[in-house]
Every structure is written in structure tokens, then in C-alpha cells.
Amino acid sequence: MNHLQRRQLFLENLLVGVNSTFHQMQKHSISTCCRSLQRILDHLILLQTTHSPVFRLDRMQLRQMQTLACLWIHRHNHDLQVTLDAIKWISP
């Protein structure tokens, strides 16, 4: 598996993890929800990058995707095609 394939898989897992956690949360205001999602994303990024030098280098870039991920979840939480498009868009 090359770097691009590993990154694609990582981003898919990240979005799936965020989406499943989001569905378990109570849906309060958007600002509260976004703050919670930021913490979830931080945690998932840290878990995925702790033991991997390749992803450790990408950590800062992944953190920059957090706002995008929050917007994506709020607007397209149940749209599979948008999920796939988002994965393609943020994958190099």
C-alpha cells in the first residue's frame, strides 16, 4: 500500500469515526456541536498519527481540515455521495 492509498484509507476512517461519534451525541447548538467535533477530530487525528511517522508529518494539515469536516457534517450528514466527494477532495 503506497502513501496515497494509506492516506485515503486514513481519511475515510477519520470521516467514518467522526460521523459515528456525531450520531451518538445530542445535537445542541451548532457552536457547541462544532466544539465537540473539534475535540473528537483532535483525538482521532492524534490516535491515527501517534505511531506513524508518515501521518505525523501530515498532522498540521489534517488539523486544518477540521473546520471543513465540521461544515461537511452539518450540511451533508446523511449524503453518501457528498461523503465520497469530500474524501476525494481532501485526498492529495
Swiss-Prot record:
Can you tell me where the transmembrane regions are? Answer: none
User: What does the UniProt entry say about where the protein is found?
Assistant: Host cytoplasm; Host mitochondrion
Q: Name one GO cellular component term.
A: host cell mitochondrion
**Superkingdom per UniProt:** Viruses
What's the chief localization of this chain? Answer: host cell
Transferase is among the record's keywords: no
The UniProt keywords, alphabetically, are: Host cytoplasm, Host mitochondrion
Q: List the disulfide bonds.
A: none
- Quaternary state and interactors: Interacts with NSP2 and NSP5.
Q: Which family does it belong to?
A: Belongs to the rotavirus A NSP6 family.
Q: What is this protein called?
A: Non-structural protein 6
